[in-house]
Amino acid sequence: IGMLDINKDNISVDVARDTGFLVGFGIDVPNLNVMGSETDPRVIGHETSYASVEGGVTAMEHLLAREPDINVVYTINEPAAEGAYQALQNAGKTGVLVVSVDGGCPGIASVKDGVIGATSQQYPLLMASKGVEAIAKFAADGTKPSASDGLTFFNTGVNLVTDAPVDGVPSIDSDRGTELCWG
């Protein structure tokens, strides 16, 4: 497993996505607040992608230099995934599963095209509307927003988008993802 992060600064969104992927994949992460705290030998390394296509190419090249037989790549976002895919193609690698996060329309198109095997689709327009509702409610009567049950934040949901579903893992296909995508 190769990890393409934003950078090495442990930015909260980078850490949450990174550790969330690893835990979901069954990797023990001793410190959920620090990227790279895992010691599982299946994780070959973390590289900085700057969340860009160009950074994804460079980061993937570094991971391939370390482990040419890599077979799973996690990326912080879909532009980094596009770059990782380019580097894999340039190296003649096939059958490598690239997974990502965001679910914007270009990323869903990449799932449909087979560039990204799966992406976690978020809903920023729903996040924004719920935020505005919370502000209006607070302004009207002082009611503060509350976190979703069992969480420290308000959960607006997420869907895994893939055209290669796995039994036991809830997902939607790229056609449905296209109906729900943004950007």
State where each predicted segment sits.
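A residue-level marker of the well-folded mature domains of exported/periplasmic proteins
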Residues: I1-G183
